[in-house]
């Protein structure tokens, strides 16, 4: 009799526990869903190319892609949303802490962190290593270095900036597929440099003639906008290119696109971006023809770019072809 009564008393407790567990799970699902909607909204508003391309990302890796791209938008917009570089540096440190906690499995209640943590759990369930903390930090450091829009000393410095931002975002995306491939990373490096250089060129009018703070969007996904607390323009073409073309900042501010030498300077920088696209296409043709890429990857051996041994040349060629197809698919021939 006592046992039956005890059983009756315990049943509501088990029911409450079951309800509590279900409610917690439902809350977690809702939180991830809201984070996904937030990240999609950021891409739709500020980075329409990435929003379009997300349809080509495998469903199993799409949350990681959205989180990576939303992360890039948020840190790119820091300069546009703070009043001075000191506050901007504090925001960048917030993102370092956020990424560090997220990769350790302790994400803060921040939409990008929530979605990234969810994506990492999915990758880990498939036996994939975590995304590189160093790559995330590299993007943050590059953005922080140019918070106040200092000029690029030379064209090589602009390429380095593009490598540390746009190319590195592609490395993170490839890792999330998941794909670890020197060949795919090599192609991504050139595509990222072309994209980053083009982004700086396309952002040039906004930087030289900044609109009122916090009222502009970035539909082209550029993210290279002037600090929100300043109406002072900046010409961010490489100084060596400007000197060679005879471009002066004051002429650009006074005459805009008609400034002496400006078109020649822009053409020189754009040519470098186009060179990287040509190189990527040549690499693709070589690989499809069963040849090697044609030149060495300058970042081979660095973090995340370790070489894999395939045994013999034929296996290496086949692996490279499969990796490029998996990494870029229908996008590369375009």
Enumerate the language-model features and the residues they cover.
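Catalytic cores of Mg2+-dependent Asp-rich isoprenoid enzymes
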Residues: 2-7, 17-118, 138-139, 162-168, ...
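Compositionally biased, non-globular sequence tracts
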Residues: 12-15
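Intrinsic-disorder/low-complexity, polar/charged segments
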Residues: 84, 88, 153-158, 181, ...
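Alpha-helix capping at helix-to-loop junctions
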Residues: 104, 125, 141, 145-149, ...
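Alpha-helical ds-nucleic-acid-binding substructure associated with the helix-hairpin-helix region
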Residues: 115-155, 160-163, 265
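Helix-hairpin-helix/helix-loop-helix acidic hairpins
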Residues: 147-187, 281
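Active-site beta-strand/loop microenvironment that shapes enzyme catalytic pockets
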Residues: 175, 179-215
């Amino acid at each position: 009799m006592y046992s039956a009564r005890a059983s009756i008393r315990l049943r509501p407790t088990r029911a409450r526990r079951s309800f509590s567990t279900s409610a917690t799970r439902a809350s977690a699902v809702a939180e991830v869903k809201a984070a996904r909607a937030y990240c999609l909204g950021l891409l739709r508003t500020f980075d329409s190319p990435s929003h379009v391309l997300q349809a080509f990302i495998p469903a199993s890796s799409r949350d990681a892609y959205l989180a990576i791209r939303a992360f890039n938008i948020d840190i790119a917009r820091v300069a546009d949303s703070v009043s001075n570089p000191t506050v901007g540096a504090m925001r960048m440190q917030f993102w370092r802490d956020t990424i560090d906690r997220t990769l350790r499995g302790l994400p803060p209640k921040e939409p990008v962190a929530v979605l990234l943590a969810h994506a990492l759990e999915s990758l880990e369930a498939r036996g994939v290593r975590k995304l590189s903390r160093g790559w995330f930090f590299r993007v943050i450091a590059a953005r922080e270095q140019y918070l106040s829009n200092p000029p690029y000393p030379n064209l090589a410095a602009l390429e380095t900036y593009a490598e540390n931002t746009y190319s590195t975002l592609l490395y993170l995306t490839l890792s999330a597929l998941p794909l670890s491939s020197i060949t795919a990373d090599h192609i991504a490096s050139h595509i990222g440099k072309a994209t980053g250089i083009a982004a700086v060129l396309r952002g040039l009018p906004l930087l030289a003639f900044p609109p009122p703070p916090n009222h502009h969007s970035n539909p082209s996904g550029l993210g290279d906008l002037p600090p929100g607390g300043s109406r002072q323009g900046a010409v961010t073409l490489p100084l060596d290119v400007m000197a060679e073309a005879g471009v002066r900042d004051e002429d650009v501010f006074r005459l805009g696109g008609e400034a002496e030498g400006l078109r020649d300077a822009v053409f020189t920088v754009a040519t470098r971006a186009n060179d990287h696209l040509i190189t990527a296409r040549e690499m693709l043709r070589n690989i499809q023809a069963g040849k090697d890429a044609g030149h060495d990857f300058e970042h081979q051996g660095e973090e995340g770019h370790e070489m894999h041994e395939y045994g013999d040349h034929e296996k290496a060629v086949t692996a490279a072809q499969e990796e490029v197809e998996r990494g870029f698919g229908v996008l590369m021939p375009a």
